[in-house]
């Protein structure tokens, strides 16, 4: 949150405009990825919300900025947090504004266990065929609370595709439509996996 000094839009010299300050903060955040983090480290910093004001002729008193970061390393996560607050503080100080900075550490990286991942892949190949299963996918920057379970017990997190055709698109897209034809494939996968693990030979 950036706290300035609101006032009439026709008299900006009497205000400390948090909108102007906020845009400079957002712009400066992007330099963290390109100039402060090792380019060999995958990292995403996305600003997704900017809220402030409710009248066209009034400069608001404050704005709220929200977003998320994604990376695979706790060290990089801490680096992002520290640098984001430094940038926020320095820009706000330069313009005479105050700020409130909050950084929530939500989910760690989801890292599959080797044996469980291999088993998951074999079961999927048995059901759908080898050409339909990607055993070495590009790491995703998406987050998943299943990561906490993998920190405690060995396991594997998999994706079951939605297929092609109408409604086939990435998650969080308003055009998404679940493909019911994939239900038997998903159900068969879980049955096969459970039977294999619970069989007498295993």
Sequence positions of predicted segments:
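Metal-dependent amide/peptide-bond hydrolase catalytic core
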Residues: 19-202
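Fold-level recognition of mixed alpha/beta catalytic cores in primary-metabolism enzymes, strongest
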Residues: 1-27
């Amino acid at each position: 949150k950036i706290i300035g000094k609101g006032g009439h839009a026709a008299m900006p010299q009497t205000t400390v405009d948090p909108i102007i300050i906020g845009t400079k903060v957002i712009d400066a955040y992007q330099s963290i990825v390109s100039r402060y983090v090792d380019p060999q480290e995958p990292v995403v910093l996305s600003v997704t919300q900017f809220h402030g004001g409710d009248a066209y002729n009034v400069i608001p008193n404050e704005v709220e900025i929200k977003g998320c970061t994604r990376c695979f390393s706790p060290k990089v996560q801490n680096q992002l947090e520290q640098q984001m607050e430094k940038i926020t503080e320095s820009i706000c100080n330069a313009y005479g504004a105050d700020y409130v900075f909050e950084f929530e550490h939500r989910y760690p990286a989801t890292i599959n266990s080797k044996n469980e991942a291999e088993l998951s892949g074999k079961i999927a190949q048995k059901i759908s065929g080898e050409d339909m299963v990607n055993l070495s996918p590009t790491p995703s920057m998406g987050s998943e609370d299943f990561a906490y379970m993998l920190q405690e017990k060995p396991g594997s997190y998999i994706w079951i595709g939605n297929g092609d055709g109408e409604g086939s698109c990435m998650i969080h897209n308003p055009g998404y439509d679940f493909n019911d034809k994939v239900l038997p494939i998903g159900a068969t996968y879980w049955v096969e996996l459970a039977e294999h693990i619970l069989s007498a030979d295993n």
